[in-house]
Amino acid sequence: MAEAKNRVCLVVIDGWGISNETKGNAILNAKTPVMDELCVMNSHPIQAHGLHVGLPEGLMGNSEVGHLNIGAGRVVYQDIVRINLAVKNKTLVENKHLKEAAERAIKGNGRMHLCGLVSDGGVHSHIDHLFALITALKQLKVPKLYIQFFGDGRDTSPTSGVGFLQQLIDFVNKEQYGEISTIVGRYYAMDRDKRWERIRVCYDALIGGVGEKTTIDKAIDVIKGRYAKDETDEFLKPIILSDEGRTKDGDTLIFFDYRADRMREITECMGMERYKDLNSNIKHPKNMQVIGMTQYKAEFTFPALFPPESHKNVLAEWLSVNGLTQFHCAETEKYAHVTFFFNGGVEKQFANEERCLVVSPKVATYDLEPPMSSAAVADKVIEQLHMKKHPFVMCNFAPPDMVGHTGVYEAAVKAVEATDIAIGRIYEACKKNDYILMVTADHGNAEKMMAPDGSKHTAHTCNLVPFTCSSMKYKFMDKLPDREMALCDVAPTVLKVMGVPLPSEMTGQPLVNEA
């Protein structure tokens, strides 16, 4: 077994952000002598929100993403951010799976379809992604492109569809490429409740041209006529704009929604055998290829433009590879975070990894029991520290986040104080058993319990979080040369303190210099 230069105990506090605002700040106003000492002694604030953790810019962090980044030692970009960056940097044209789809179309019958929700709602799809795909496919020289327009009206206003259709018409005219072939509401195209009779309406339209026939120059007037009869974007019955734009034998179809749940049924019918459940009279085309924007379901046989990324050699795996044992502990509410998410989004327990689940209190809301099971989690961790069995011990403390979500300020103060007491007990055990204690948080919460208007604030925040190290041999540097410090730097810092070399997959940086 490899030897660790130092043993490390990593504590991840849930929902502990840094803010100088005193009003409604359950962290600043609580008695936290232990965290105060650790922060003054040797610490640095780090970023835990937005692009720093792979989320869209300005979006508050969350527990899942926080633990994923902490454990991975790299920024783990969410699907939407990966797509947005490809669109912004104009690199879609280099996407391996898009190039393969284009080659298939070119070598085959020359026909490609883009199918999806056309709006700027940003929940399931974005019109900018559609524009970028049209541009990329034109650059890749796909001869014929057909666009199947799914009306929104749910994540956007109910009659905004004509505006999005006009934008698409203008874009296609400007590019002199692509043809809008079908318009149908998401009610029929994007069902997720196995209401196959709805999906059949869309299926019959896309393949068989079943619907009201008109031309592109009259399409907006047709939709406005539907609005007058209270048939809004979501519920638009199929409008067929060209016979050529039906899906035919040998066609290639890209569905450009990035959210999976409402794409599963329609793609399973178009790209797999599920169409048999529709009892449609329309003959299913042969040799069609479906591609998703993302992986809609692990069991689906067709490719995705942005498949899930595998996170090889996350901290837990790397310690295991190096023959080092480890211990992960949390109460029920956060157990998945110290196992599945901390381990890179995999359920698998690595070799020499021990886990411990402490049951969360059975109460209606956690403001009724602010300390939650923090004392019991500390007990389990201290037990391990005394055994000196594992060179890496980690745990999560849930109270600041879970009680923070209740919006009850006084309870949040108690939750913060209970967490500080628990960390204090662990700190004493670390000193006695020669462990270096490192403390961080996955995102902010309890430091903002009050909104500007005085009402309860129950959400996460975009504030910085602490990162502390109890050994003065490893002093935090002032800054990184090219970016702000963030959660992705926690695992590399832990490895540096343990004296374990970093895997090449970790792009985070150690934030301490050895004295």
Curated annotation (Swiss-Prot):
Pathway: Carbohydrate degradation; glycolysis; pyruvate from D-glyceraldehyde 3-phosphate: step 3/5
Binding locations of Mn(2+) 2: D14, S63, D442, H443
Keywords tagged on the record: Glycolysis, Isomerase, Magnesium, Manganese, Metal-binding
Keyword Metal-binding on entry: yes
InterPro entries noted in UniProt: Alkaline_phosphatase_core_sf, BPG-indep_PGM_N, Metalloenzyme, PGAM_B_sf, Pgm_bpd_ind
One of the GO BP terms on file: glycolytic process
Cofactor, free-text remark: Binds 2 manganese or magnesium ions per subunit. Cobalt and nickel are less efficient.
Enzyme active site: S63
Cofactor(s) required for function per UniProt: Mg(2+); Mn(2+)
EC number: 5.4.2.12
Superkingdom per UniProt: Eukaryota
Disulfide pairings: none
Known regulation of activity: Activity is not affected by 2,3-bisphosphoglycerate.
General function of this protein: Catalyzes the interconversion of 2-phosphoglycerate and 3-phosphoglycerate.
PANTHER family associated with the record: 2,3-BISPHOSPHOGLYCERATE-INDEPENDENT PHOSPHOGLYCERATE MUTASE
Protein name stated in the entry: 2,3-bisphosphoglycerate-independent phosphoglycerate mutase
